Amino acid sequence: MTEPAPTRIYVDADACPVKDEIYKVAERHGLPVSVVAGAFIRVPAHPLIERIAAGSGMDAADDWIAERVQPGDIVVTADVPLASRCVKAGAEVLAPNGKPFSEASIGMTLAVRNLMTDLRSSGEVTGGPRAFSPRDRSTFLAALDTTIRRIARRRASPPAQQQN
């Protein structure tokens, strides 16, 4: 039996406000990070951090992540359609505010996102999400650490005892 690949953290980086926090947590746990953006993005020079310029096409960064993510990986994104694709692939997915996307919640989250997009385009709703706060940052850090530990426990337990 082969060992599963180590957990990798994929970051949908174009508008991610918690990249620095991800780098610190990943370094502490020794996890590789793929920082994926449509174009060049600055990342720290560190052997665990990989910068990916996926291209300028529509959803190029999303496609790059979705095509590579595996069960046991972590994806950080605010993009609900990308989150849906990654959850279906078996990855753990967190929004930058720490909110987890799961199989149980992704359908409703996607439906609400589509409804709000339609309402905004018709002019019935204006504005967007509230501003990112220090509390969001703290919640994200706790959620990322909890997710990493949960994956590590799952991988360490014998297959007959594994549970989600």
Swiss-Prot record:
<comment type="similarity">
    <text>Belongs to the UPF0178 family.</text>
</comment>
<dbReference type="Pfam" id="PF02639">
    <property type="entry name" value="DUF188"/>
</dbReference>
<protein>
    <recommendedName>
        <fullName>UPF0178 protein RPD_2254</fullName>
    </recommendedName>
</protein>
<dbReference type="InterPro" id="IPR003791">
    <property type="entry name" value="UPF0178"/>
</dbReference>
